[in-house]
Amino acid sequence: MYKIVLLRHGESTWNKDNRFTGWTDVDLTEKGVEEARGAGHLLKREGYTFDLAYTSVLKRANKTLNIVLEELDSLWLPVEHSWRLNERHYGDLQGLNKAETAAKFGDDQVLVWRRSYDTPPPPLPEGDERLTSGDPRYASLPRAQFPRTECLKDTVARFVPYWETVIVPNILAGRRILIAAHGNSLRALIKYLDNISDSEIVGLNIPTAQPLVYELDANLRPIRSYYLADADTIRAAEAAVAGQGKAKG
């Protein structure tokens, strides 16, 4: 049996402001830092150790991972960064308040943009200042392939090949893996691992900084998955995420 741990970053400044973030490189809030410390403490208490970690190229995931590794006294751990683990690109919604967007377009439309499998938000216009294709962290990504928007299907298409070619060989080699990423990049991986249908994936919400353990068989099929925190904590955290995209009453 193999075991991996998935972790969404702690609360970011735009999580706090209830804004669509996507590839915008925002920082953690003080609460997010404390959430990351709590995740590290929980992993340490439960006896988890790791050989290798993976994360995106966005600071909120990087900082979360570093804080967790510090709590585990494992800052020396090898870490691999890839844009393929980034949050999904939210296109022209990036920077907009979710509740205000829901009030304008309706809760149902925003739910489709946030949680559906194959419907992307409106794309960023050409030349928009929010495009970060010139950023050196994306030097390996051809400009023509740089996303201006993404749906979850697009996120699956970029993450799963990285999982199969980079992460899986290390799992099969017996290395203990921690993946610190984002709500939708983790939803993409979980959809693939658990073979969740396109319609059912709408209801999957990933809370911030809650370690999620996957136990995998010899063929890397899930045996079971579970959060380390208690069920009431997770239910409340998932409900909070689900409510972010609704208009205020």
UniProtKB/Swiss-Prot annotation:
One Pfam family matching this protein: His_Phos_1
Quaternary context: Homodimer.
One of the protein's GO biological processes: gluconeogenesis
Protein name: 2,3-bisphosphoglycerate-dependent phosphoglycerate mutase
Alphabetized UniProt keyword annotations: Gluconeogenesis, Glycolysis, Isomerase
CDD domains xrefs: HP_PGM_like
Enzyme class: isomerase
Entry's EC annotation: 5.4.2.11
Similarity-based family: Belongs to the phosphoglycerate mutase family. BPG-dependent PGAM subfamily.
NCBIfam families: pgm_1, PRK14115.1
Site (Transition state stabilizer): H182
Gene3D superfamilies: Phosphoglycerate mutase-like (3.40.50.1240)
